From Swiss-Prot:
It comes from the Bacteria. Condenses 4-methyl-5-(beta-hydroxyethyl)thiazole monophosphate (THZ-P) and 2-methyl-4-amino-5-hydroxymethyl pyrimidine pyrophosphate (HMP-PP) to form thiamine monophosphate (TMP). Binds 1 Mg(2+) ion per subunit. The lineage of its organism: Bacteria, Bacillati, Bacillota, Bacilli, Bacillales. GO terms for cellular component: cytoplasm. GO terms for molecular function: magnesium ion binding; thiamine-phosphate diphosphorylase activity. This is Thiamine-phosphate synthase. InterPro entries: Aldolase_TIM, ThiamineP_synth_sf, ThiamineP_synth_TenI, TMP_synthase. Pathway: Cofactor biosynthesis; thiamine diphosphate biosynthesis; thiamine phosphate from 4-amino-2-methyl-5-diphosphomethylpyrimidine and 4-methyl-5-(2-phosphoethyl)-thiazole: step 1/1. Keywords: Magnesium, Metal-binding, Thiamine biosynthesis, Transferase.
């Protein structure tokens, strides 16, 4: 097995759905199924915050979601927990700046996908040099889903990464909706990551389809 290519990674980031049990008002397994039917390109399991599952319940839930992703041939990424990613044999892991260091993560994950949230050009250069496959850049817009976010960067912040010669695949993070997706892609992102735009939508399927259309139209 070898590391994922830049071109392949770029395609996978198109519509990146992030979800935990506490991000949904409907059955999360059904929400994920609808999102997959609508053609999300990658899924991240993020079980954090108020009301999140813990211990065995969390692991069992992750396995259920992973099995559904496998049915559809969509990569299953674990948020911030390298040990769980290894235990589940997940397709990859996504870490933040306050989590385990990129060098250690890459060593443990081998050739699997490693994504890193970055907020500055310096952080980006460091994680690229040490094995990141893609960057999560943001928050682009204000978000209520994540309580521990940094200052809003706007699409200008995202464009700045490209202007400074960062060529690695980038997914925009934070407050992204169907309405503002085009502006994120036009600023230089390869894709958009969303939580509530799909998890709280009246129809996760319809919302995903619209996001896919917006990304395709803007690339």
């Amino acid at each position: 097995m070898s590391r994922i290519s830049k071109a392949e990674m770029s395609k996978l980031l198109s519509v990146y759905f992030i979800m935990g049990s506490n991000n949904c008002t409907k059955d999360p397994l059904q929400v994920l199924r609808e999102a997959l039917e609508g053609f999300i390109t990658i899924f991240q399991f993020r079980e954090k915050g108020e009301g999140a599952l813990t211990g065995e319940e969390r692991i069992c839930f992750a396995k259920e979601l992973q099995a559904i992703c496998k049915e559809y041939g969509v990569p299953f990424i674990v948020n911030d927990d390298v040990e769980l990613a290894l235990e589940l044999d997940a397709d990859g892991v996504h870490v933040g700046q306050d989590d385990e260091g990129i060098t250690s993560v890459r060593e443990k994950m081998g050739d699997k996908i490693v994504g890193v949230s970055t907020h500055t050009i310096e952080e980006a250069r460091w994680v690229i040099e040490n094995g990141a496959d893609y960057l999560g850049v943001g928050p682009i817009f204000p978000t209520s889903t994540k309580k521990d976010t940094k200052a809003v960067q706007g699409t200008k912040g995202l464009a700045h990464f490209r202007e400074q010669g960062i060529t690695i695949p980038i997914v925009g993070i934070g407050g992204i909706s169907i309405e503002n997706t085009a502006s994120v892609i036009e600023a230089g992102a390869d894709g958009v990551s969303v939580i509530s735009a799909i998890s709280l939508a009246e129809s996760a399927y319809e919302s995903t389809k619209k996001l896919v259309e917006e990304v395709s139209r803007s690339l």
